[in-house]
Swiss-Prot record:
Designated gene of the protein: tsx
Keyword Ion transport: yes
Matching SUPFAM superfamilies: Tsx-like channel
InterPro entries linked: Channel_Tsx, Channel_Tsx-like, Channel_Tsx-like_sf
UniProt record similarity statement: Belongs to the nucleoside-specific channel-forming outer membrane porin (Tsx) (TC 1.B.10) family.
Protein name: Nucleoside-specific channel-forming protein Tsx
Family matches, as NCBIfam families: PRK15106.1
Lineage, top ranks: Bacteria, Pseudomonadati, Pseudomonadota, Gammaproteobacteria, Enterobacterales
């Protein structure tokens, strides 16, 4: 789910890098030589994308591809497939049966046959980030499209760095007031740093941060029990990942920091019918991922 994108993206980026080297030496067998895919089991702890803290364990399919002008990352989740806490609703307990996120980028340089590089900017993309939550009713559905400009940066260091800036169009958003309109912006930074060989595998550090701002949600008429705005116009999600990858198996541990997670105001007082509670949308969460590349 969007809760796990930063963990999952780290694993996929690492999988691609390591698999290329492993293919030269050990010739591991995959279904495709360019569409890199895996099945993962993901455990999440204290994720903060909704008004209540969530823990769950779920099944995930993810894929990564980079071929000519096409750069792709995406995943499909079956939420709460293996269970979760009382606030986690998913495939088996009347929650959403499917959550999907994709990040296709299309190289402007290659599609126009033009070298647009200058300075540290190696290549330019039409960048997209689409999020879909199937849900079972309007209060569980989300459909969000971020679109904009992306680039890869030459840092001169043994690391990769990409930047994307988007405008957001919001369709469904769990019944929030900003549905069916242009609503804010996102800046995304992603980096990958190979560290060392470890236990026969490859250990890397990966970081992802989303900065969201300019949304109308912070100015709507949804107030908490104390008369304060329950939503915000901005949020930050920043993940820090250690990933260990082999030819087929991969493992990662993720620490993720949320600020106004899901654009919920931290410490807002709410009551959805089961008694009052305080929103905890700012703080740390974590993930553990085990996956198999095929």
């Amino acid at each position: 789910m969007k809760k796990t994108l930063l963990a999952a993206g780290a694993v996929v980026a690492l999988s691609t890098t390591f698999a290329a080297g492993a293919a030269e030496n050990d010739k591991p067998q995959y279904l495709s030589d360019w569409w890199h895919q895996s099945v993962n089991v993901v455990g999440s702890y204290h994720t903060r994308f909704g008004p209540q803290i969530r823990n769950d364990t779920y099944l995930e399919y993810e894929a990564f591809a980079k071929k000519d002008w096409f750069d792709f990352y995406g995943y499909i989740d079956a939420p709460v497939f293996f269970g979760g806490n009382s606030t986690a609703k998913g495939i088996w307990n009347k929650g959403s049966p499917l959550f999907m996120e994709i990040e296709p980028r299309f190289s402007i340089d290659k599609l126009t046959n033009t070298d647009l590089s200058f300075g540290p900017f190696k290549e330019w993309y039409f960048a997209n980030n689409y999020i879909y939550d199937m849900g079972r009713n309007d209060s569980q559905e989300q459909s969000t499209w971020y679109m904009g400009l992306g680039t890869d940066i030459d840092t001169g260091l043994p690391m990769s760095l990409s930047l994307n800036v988007y405008a957001k169009y919001q369709w469904q958003n769990y019944g929030a007031s900003n549905e069916n309109e242009w609503d804010g912006y996102r800046f995304k930074v992603k980096y990958f740093v190979p560290l060392t060989d470890l236990w026969g595998g490859s250990l890397s550090y990966i970081g992802f941060t989303n900065f969201d701002w300019g949304s109308d949600l912070g100015d709507d008429n949804f107030y908490d029990l104390n008369g304060k705005h329950a939503r915000t116009s901005n949020s930050i999600a920043s993940s820090h990942i250690l990933a260990l990858n082999y030819a087929h198996w991969h493992y990662s541990i993720v620490a993720r920091y949320f600020h106004n997670g899901g654009q919920w105001a931290d410490d807002a007082k709410l009551n959805f019918g089961d008694g009052p509670f305080s929103v905890r949308s700012t703080g740390w969460g974590g993930y553990f991922v085990v996956g198999y590349n095929f």
